[in-house]
């Protein structure tokens, strides 16, 4: 079992290292961005490596100054930096609400309107053919969350649009995410968490796209917050509640015995349940979070196999994995059933996953593999029949595969540009996501979105992303190069593996 554990962990390390190499090289040598906010076409440019090195050196100097101050002032500096970071998020997030005037648009507007109409008593929101939710039933969880916020806002009796209140809640949730990620660092770097936490807070302060996303009335920010809390509780569970390290105990005859502590207490159970709850909520708010759930399940699997785990702890971790799988897969259907029962109607199965896969192999006006409407057009053409939609999608996939085989150079170019457009955009499409407004946006922010400051914002995001990818790459290299210790250092090796897996999960 230990050999299988080592083999599995090493495979994950190598694959993560390869991913880090691709991400850093792509981001360091190129930048993807959008200039025209109407077409939102993704453009590609090659960067000046010397300029990028200068930006990395600037961040290095910033980190060095931060660590120097941390060494002199100690805990006061770290706490002050945390307060400053959270205050900065609240300040900038509030300014975006007042001066940015972003409004929901596209899918975000459809879900927002669905929640508002439901509150007004419109039961046609739940309908097998006429409803937006019959195309995208996975949005039912976000609709439930927005319904709660809108009902709270309606209690105030104010005439201000409710989406401004939603954005304020999102700013607070962003602070929650940062706070719990900050607290998670103590479990990831128990020996060096103070300097690491300072560097983390510096990165958060410089992460302008994340703050800009607080005005995006969609599922990203609340799901991100739930994930951060759930992962913190998971790390706490693994590190505190069911640790895998040797401890000395005293037997009845006063003989010192080396064993492993695996006490199953109420704290352990509630920590596990809390982690499952928040991770499940993240899926309810944004179905894409299932990707992170898969990563969590892999972590639980590896932790169950970790040397030093007792049979009881192993069973507990596997039971947690089973529970998390059930709740994550079942939460959206459960919410959907609740709404269907209240409405006395049903929703269709929705746009098929295979149509998304087919769309990812096609061109669009924005870029290779981006949204072009194929999924919803196919669902309509199939008469909202999932089997027929899948048949059309399979035919489209086979057609593209045949074309790629006939034109291998085009295939390489297609997937290279698709990869870069998704992973070499340091703004993370934050301007496009928060572009919509009904007027009142300040002149300064207009320049950021479509004017002279847009290029500066793009460059800022690119520099930040280079730092992130470089840090990930260096950590992966250091972890892979570390030699396997002898049997006497098995716990040290397991701790390194624990840190690596969970850092990959956070990344």
Q: Which stretches of residues belong to each language-model region?
A:
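Transmembrane-helix signature of polytopic, membrane-embedded enzymes
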Residues: 181-206, 486-493
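Multi-pass, polyprenyl lipid-linked donor-dependent membrane glycosyltransferases
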Residues: 166-173, 199-234, 282-292, 507
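Transmembrane-helix motifs of polytopic, lipid-linked glycan transferases
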Residues: 168-190, 229, 474-478
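Membrane-proximal stem/loop segments at transmembrane-domain junctions that anchor or position
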Residues: 337-440
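Short hydrophobic/aromatic helix or loop-helix immediately within or flanking a transmembrane segment
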Residues: 113-114, 131-159
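Membrane-interface anchor segments at the N-terminal boundary of transmembrane helices
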Residues: 24, 42-57, 161-170, 418-496, ...
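Start-transfer (signal-anchor) and selected internal transmembrane alpha helices
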Residues: 1-95, 314-322
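Extracytosolic helix-loop segments that constitute the early lumenal/periplasmic catalytic or substrate-binding loops
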Residues: 109-134, 141, 367-373
């Amino acid at each position: 079992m230990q050999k299988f554990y080592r083999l599995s962990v090493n495979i994950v390390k190598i694959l993560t290292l390869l991913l880090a190499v691709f991400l850093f090289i792509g981001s360091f040598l190129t930048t993807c961005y959008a200039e025209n906010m109407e077409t939102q076409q993704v453009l590609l440019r090659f960067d000046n490596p010397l300029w990028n090195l200068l930006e990395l050196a600037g961040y290095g100097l910033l980190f060095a100054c931060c660590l120097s101050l941390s060494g002199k002032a100690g805990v006061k500096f770290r706490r002050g930096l945390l307060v400053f970071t959270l205050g900065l998020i609240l300040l900038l997030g509030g300014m975006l609400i007042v001066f940015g005037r972003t409004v929901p648009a596209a899918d975000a507007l459809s879900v927002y309107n669905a929640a508002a109409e439901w509150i007004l008593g419109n039961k046609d929101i739940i309908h097998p053919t006429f409803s937006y939710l019959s195309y995208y039933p996975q949005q039912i969880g976000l609709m439930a969350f927005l319904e709660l916020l809108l009902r709270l806002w309606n209690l105030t009796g104010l005439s201000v649009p409710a989406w401004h209140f939603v954005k304020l809640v999102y700013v607070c949730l962003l602070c929650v995410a940062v706070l719990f990620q900050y607290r998670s660092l103590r479990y990831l770097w128990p020996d060096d968490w103070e300097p690491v936490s300072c560097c983390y807070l510096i990165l958060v302060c410089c992460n302008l796209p994340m703050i800009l996303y607080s005005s995006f009335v969609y599922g990203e920010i609340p799901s991100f917050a739930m994930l951060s809390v759930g992962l913190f509780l998971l790390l706490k569970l693994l590190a505190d509640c069911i640790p895998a390290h040797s401890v000395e105990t005293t037997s009845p005859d006063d003989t010192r015995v080396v064993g492993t502590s695996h006490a199953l207490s109420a704290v352990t159970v509630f920590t596990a349940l809390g982690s499952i709850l928040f991770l499940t909520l993240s899926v309810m708010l944004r179905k894409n979070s299932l990707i992170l759930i898969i990563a969590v399940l892999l972590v639980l699997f590896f932790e169950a196999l970790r040397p030093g785990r007792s049979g009881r702890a192993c069973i507990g971790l596997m039971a947690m994995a089973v529970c998390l799988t059930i709740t994550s897969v079942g939460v959206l259907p459960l919410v959907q059933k609740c709404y269907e029962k209240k409405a006395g109607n049903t929703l269709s199965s929705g746009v098929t996953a295979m149509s998304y896969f087919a769309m990812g192999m096609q061109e669009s006006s924005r870029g290779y593999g981006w949204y072009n409407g194929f999924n919803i057009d196919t669902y309509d053409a199939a008469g909202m029949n999932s089997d027929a939609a899948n048949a059309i999608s399979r035919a489209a996939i086979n057609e593209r595969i045949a074309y790629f085989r006939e034109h291998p150079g085009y295939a390489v170019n297609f997937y290279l540009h698709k990869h870069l457009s998704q992973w070499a955009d340091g703004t993370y499409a934050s301007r496009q996501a928060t572009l919509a407004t009904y007027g009142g946006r300040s002149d300064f922010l207009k320049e950021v979105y479509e004017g002279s400051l847009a290029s500066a914002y793009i460059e800022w995001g690119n520099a930040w992303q280079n730092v992130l990818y470089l840090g990930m790459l260096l950590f992966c290299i250091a972890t892979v190069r570390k030699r396997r210790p002898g049997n006497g250092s098995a716990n040290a090796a397991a701790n390194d593996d624990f840190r690596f897996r969970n850092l990959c999960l956070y990344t």
